[in-house]
């Protein structure tokens, strides 16, 4: 690509795709600049193959005789078809299949950017909304017999159940566990005896601000717990696509960091385009019609102290330009659904809105990119039946949850992030504990509650690939595209970069493909459902079957 053309594009604020740049280099410098000048007049910010399809008429007028045909041939655009049906319809011919795929993506929930002033009363309303939503779920559970409100509990001993929000938690001098629970009518102390091992173990993992149901006996003075019931996200019926299509799940690309594994990321893009691997691998790659990117797409600027020492791109917009340049290479029939994370150019408080045009304008120029909030709920639709719902959440709450839950901290859940997601599903909430993440309270709905149960939940943040199944919900945790940072070494994290989970949406079978090697790609794990379990075969471990319950 000629340096003069690149400099001219930069002066015009235009991002030039590598493939188009190489084609333009075959024209005279004057003609190439004329084309770029025309692009800037059309308010195009990215010059790629798709742009030439859309603006065929305008570009024909300024190009020399035969030049348009030459450019189209080199870019792989079918000019024979466009001549038969007119240039205007060329776009629909080239993009008809990809547009169908974008119509198959329905955004069910994506939070907007609130501008309202937040007051103390908004937090009060927020917790009341959370309680009411969880109570509606819990009161359907048959285990909660004789359900009553706290203000209706008498001083006489009796058996009953209550639903409340955990206001306090402490260990008594006799090593029993005491919870203070509140509902909209009052508070009550409940005791979990250490001799009831199963209930006691369950109670140890309860976080403050969780909404739970308890069954037992007692009076207004003291209530003794026999059973704890959590809200539990339960998928009653699994949903499958009618079409044989797959979804790939990635996150934590961290473009702009010196640790960004660009070569491996481009290798993944080459694979998804069907240009890498043996015939079977290429065939499987072309089944991927959806790419979910779950946050931390760039490394950002000023996210943590002295970050600039580890950055090779120190401007946020330039980081997004680089990201857009990479994503623009992905074939156009792949719908890319992208939500932000803590390193992206949006507010840190959750729910985080979709990436805006101020810094991430290059992404808005890509037709096959769908920008959603964090969290977001997306459906891949079927024609005549329910589609497959996918809940995206980057996962800022995962580390605070691990630190606050004994059982997760003990098993070092940073290495098995699906266990943290299981905890979220049990509590039906992405961040049960107040202050674990900064959030914006909504007086109408708890946007971090799992109100609509998904078929698949996908997360990132911990830089470890992992898959699991819980209550029929498929859990997919993404890897990263960044080598180990000094911070991760300091805290003892062990990232596994360049590993991509692929889910067949027709069968719900899962593969994890490794792009970390220089020469070849390898399926390192394959999983299939058997009833309520996910049976996985891990390559290189004597083909043992690992049962994930």
Label for each model-derived stretch:
Residues 1-549:
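Extended recognition/assembly regions associated with phosphoester-bond processing machinery
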